[in-house]
Amino acid sequence: MSSLSQKKNSRLKRQVRVRKKIKGTAERPRLNVFKSAKHIYAQLINDADGSTVASASTLLDEVSTGLDYTGNKEAAQKVGAALAKKALAKEISKVVFDRNGFLYHGRIKALAEAARENGLSF
């Protein structure tokens, strides 16, 4: 097994293990984060009825304007700020953070801190 597929399998195992414990509700949805090499995606999920409350990613024009590259910490900060603004518009201030098996470092940390700075608490 190559080191890349082993790393992905380890992340998926962490994801399953944590997902058993973390559930989002209507009052406190789950902030789910996914990152690829070029983009980062974040969404607020209500697990009780399986719906997405709000979402933001570097694919949105409001986030990607003014960015040279969408796969860095600066882009992650803009995604976190945009998601926090959408959540506060729907009167959601408390969330459960789900890092989706990724390490809390780099882009994941930048997104989380930007969301906290813009009004979300977790």
From Swiss-Prot:
It comes from the Bacteria. Pfam families: Ribosomal_L18p. GO terms for molecular function: 5S rRNA binding; structural constituent of ribosome. Residues 1-21 are annotated as: Disordered. InterPro entries: Ribosomal_uL18_bac-type, Ribosomal_uL18_bac/euk. Residues 8-21 have a biased composition (Basic residues). Belongs to the universal ribosomal protein uL18 family. Part of the 50S ribosomal subunit; part of the 5S rRNA/L5/L18/L25 subcomplex. Contacts the 5S and 23S rRNAs. This is Large ribosomal subunit protein uL18. The lineage of its organism: Bacteria, Pseudomonadati, Thermodesulfobacteriota, Desulfuromonadia, Geobacterales. The gene is rplR.
